[in-house]
């Protein structure tokens, strides 16, 4: 099995897992009672509000798992002397975050033409921002800069409800599609 097949297998496993999770969330969700203590200040999303952030983080973890391996794959395949780790040490070369650093390594060192994959890269970068809010702020945008909060509000399939990031099923599926497309393009380059 080659690296592209491994990625395809992981994506299909994730699709199956997400399908089951969403079915569980739908079956388990219920509308909160209006008589409940605290009433309307709580979000009426049921269990799905916990499932979707988990799924978004899983999609980004898939990308974050495979990109360093793809960098190593292309380093070995191209007999490149500069490793990803060495590239990361040079502050003038690396990106503002790991995702940008991987992309720069693949395009500048491994010389892959990823121009056609820029729409997927941008969607993965959006996913990275959303994932960071889930992981580092519990989904709350109160402490984010206005610029980051506005960026998140403009993302398709993402909304803010009472200063909490909410993602749709469509956001999850499209993020997984873009992750798969981007990783497959790199694996097959």
Locations of regions flagged by a protein language model:
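Extended intrinsically disordered or low-complexity regions, especially N/C-terminal cytosolic tails and loops
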Residues: 1-79, 110-125, 129, 145-189
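A contiguous pocket-lining binding segment that forms or flanks enzyme active sites
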Residues: 82-132
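Short conserved catalytic/interaction loops centered on acidic-Pro-aromatic/His motifs
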Residues: 135-149
């Amino acid at each position: 099995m080659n690296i592209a097949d491994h990625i395809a297998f992981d994506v299909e496993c994730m699709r199956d897992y997400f399908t089951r999770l969403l079915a569980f969330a739908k079956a388990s969700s219920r509308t909160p009672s209006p008589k409940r203590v605290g009433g309307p200040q709580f979000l009426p999303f049921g269990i799905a509000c916990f499932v979707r952030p988990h799924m978004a983080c899983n999609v980004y973890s898939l990308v974050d798992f495979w990109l360093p391996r793809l960098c190593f794959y292309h380093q070995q395949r191209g007999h490149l002397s500069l490793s990803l780790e060495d590239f990361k040490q040079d502050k003038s070369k690396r990106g503002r975050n790991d995702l940008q650093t991987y992309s720069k390594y693949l395009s500048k060192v491994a010389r892959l033409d990823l121009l056609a994959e820029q729409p997927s890269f941008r969607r993965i970068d959006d996913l990275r921002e959303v994932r960071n809010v889930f992981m580092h702020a519990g989904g709350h945008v109160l402490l984010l800069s206005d610029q980051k909060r506005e960026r998140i509000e403009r993302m398709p399939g993402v909304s803010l409800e009472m200063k909490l990031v909410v993602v749709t099923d469509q956001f999850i599926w499209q993020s997984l599609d873009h992750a798969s497309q981007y990783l497959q393009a790199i694996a097959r380059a």
